[in-house]
Amino acid sequence: MNHKLTLKEKVGYGMGDAAANLVWRGALAYLAVFYTDTFGITAAAAAMLFLVVRLSDGVTDIIMGMIADRTQTKMGKFRPWILGSTPFLGLFMVLCFTTPDLSYSGKLIYAYLTYIGLTLAYTVNNVPYSALMGVMTSDDRERTSLSGFRFAGAFFGGLLVMGCLPMLVDLLGQGNTAVGYQYTMWLFATLLVILMCVTVFTTKERVTLQQVSKPQDTKLDSPKTETGTQVVPAPRSLTSELIDLGKQLPLILVPLSAITAFFYYRDALTGAFFITVIALTTIAIKRLTRRPEAENTRSQQDIIDLLSNKPWLILLGMGFLTMMFNGIKYGVIAYYFKYYMGNELLTGYFFISLLVVSIFGALATSKLAAMFGRKKLFIIALLASSVLTSGIYFVPQKSVSAIFILGCSAEFFAAILPTLFFSMLGDSADYSEYKTGRRATGLVYSAGSFVQKTGGGFAGALVLLVLGSYGYNGLDINTINQTLPGMKSLMSWIPALFGFAGAALICLYPLNDEKQKEVTQALLSRRSEQPPISA
């Protein structure tokens, strides 16, 4: 049955993303400027750091999704991982903003180790957290409502870290920025642990996979054709399946390496390498998907199921583009107000304004989706936010009020995007189960988390690469004036391009609200007739 969630459970779930965003938005907004202006790493080196660390995410997100899907405890599949990873997430949050007295090479090594540690802990925590939404209820409207609470919590956490961090650094550091960052992060790490515990102990996992016959006709318009027998790969140990997954990882890592190299170097050689890799990867994927199901292991079949899931593939592209859109803006704000506007304290006030508006945008998403439909709302929100963001380019340099008005207006619509994205990921998991009789909720959400983090990493790297191309050096004030045009572009039309691209892509999304209801009803019918099995 479709379980209606209580307000307590929705708020409790939202507290988890408030905690996660103390890390996520703190790193997104301030880690780049911390590396370049406090720790003394060059913009180009920091850009490469952000890109390389995202390659490790390509492995850990997918592996974590598979591990979570195969976890069976009294607490469920996902909540034990959230609870166990929380202390490590808080610790690495502090370490990333700590400045040990090292040589330049030592600083780079330290930055790589601590940032990789942070992203690994975030993966182990946030992949299960994201997937938890998919098993708390099977009602798509309840998921949209829950997603609204999630991102209201996210923006509340972001409000704390992004709005208060500059003031806390100044207050606790007493003129020593490095000390101020470290003490501030200890405060946020403590709060993170408390909020994550609230989430774990106020939520419950309810949705389980059912043993069903695989439909012969998997077209969306034929949901009731359920004859035929599902081919279920023989159970194997998690270790065996992870080893098997390792054999499939080149399909992820090699294309990621190619696009990372091309993104950073932007020359003919890396461009040719990227095109070649994509062509070979496409051939390899086609060969894999044509194999008979009986020859596939479970991990292979999970990957095949998702690669044939058009809604999921489109959502992955949307996740990347929307994160580039939001990530570029958030990544340059600290630089923009410190140097372009000439008032660093405005950074915190601007973030507070954005995040207050974001909370209203996230909470309004459920009602707006009911009015327009989620697909149409996604398009409207992207176009409106992109147009308003691009308008910042034409605002005079000292027009603070105009910047705040345009920025907040754009942020209201931008806040709708992640709320819809994670709600619709649950729909794509339903669609996969509908077509194949198999469900891999953790893998679906881990991939969603991966593209979001990849988009954030590429967005941060793009900010640093653009600033570096203008000759920016955070320790040399003489380089600032020449980088102001780059800051202006990064705050306006550059992110808007990714928003317009996202609006075009979502037009291809095949699941409107009516079709999603068909899928939901078909699955509810199956679940009422069949006993549950482990997913």
Please name every model-derived segment.
Residues M1-A535:
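Membrane-embedded alpha-helical bundles of multi-pass transporters/translocases
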